[in-house]
């Protein structure tokens, strides 16, 4: 089985995905990390190279390669504007696609930054000083990516819950079971 986690930036796809994979005994893949490895680049360089369509095509290629890997997996998917690169997988019977959703305020609370070398860091003073700007940008992202996620039927509202609680709720809501071969 493949569990896709979709959602806007900073909604919690990677953290939730890692924890869910660990709980279920599945492999975990993060599209950002897979893109960095495959194209031998940083995210900073990747997002500043080529057009959005070209970047989404490259992401689609990495999705295809990752989907060919055997075994159960949880796969966190970076927001992609050109959804053709993942829509073909949504109808597969061994795929559970979930869009993680939350309010712009809750997403803001989880907001982290990264430098040009992709090192993640928190800067709550800066973040809070620019709160209105970031809330507006998060709302724009939610609005902009809604069409991309239209075919993802499972919408999971996180309600500001902790990652541990979100994983518990996902396991219960979708009746997920551990992979006995890996646990």
Locations of the language-model features?
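Glycine-rich phosphate-binding loop used to anchor ATP phosphates in small-molecule kinases
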Residues: 56-94, 100
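A glycine- and Lys/Arg-enriched "phosphate-lid" helix/loop adjacent to the NTP-binding pocket
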Residues: 94-144
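Hydrophobic anchor at the beta1->P-loop junction of P-loop NTPases
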Residues: 5
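Conserved substrate/cofactor phosphate-moiety recognition/catalytic segment
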Residues: 22-64
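P-loop (Walker A) phosphate-binding loop of NTP-binding proteins
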Residues: 8
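ATP-binding Walker
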Residues: 11
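NTP-dependent small-molecule kinase module
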Residues: 23, 96, 143-183
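Walker A/P-loop
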Residues: 14
């Amino acid at each position: 089985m493949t569990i896709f986690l979709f959602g806007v930036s900073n909604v919690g796809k990677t953290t939730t995905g890692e924890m869910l994979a660990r709980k279920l005994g599945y492999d975990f893949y993060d599209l950002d990390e897979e893109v960095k490895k495959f194209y031998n680049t940083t995210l900073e360089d990747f997002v500043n190279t080529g057009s959005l369509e070209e970047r989404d095509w490259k992401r689609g290629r990495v999705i295809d390669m990752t989907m060919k890997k055997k075994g159960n997996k949880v796969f966190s998917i970076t927001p992609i504007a050109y959804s053709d690169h993942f829509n073909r997988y949504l109808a597969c019977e061994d795929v559970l696609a979930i869009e993680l959703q939350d309010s712009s305020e809750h997403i803001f609370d989880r907001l982290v930054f990264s430098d040009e070398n992709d090192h993640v860091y928190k800067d709550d003073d800066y973040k809070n000083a620019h709160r209105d700007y970031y809330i507006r940008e998060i709302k724009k992202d939610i609005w902009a990516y809604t069409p991309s996620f239209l075919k993802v039927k499972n919408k999971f509202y996180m309600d500001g819950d902790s990652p541990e609680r979100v994983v518990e709720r996902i396991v219960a809501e979708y009746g997920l079971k551990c992979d006995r071969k890996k646990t």
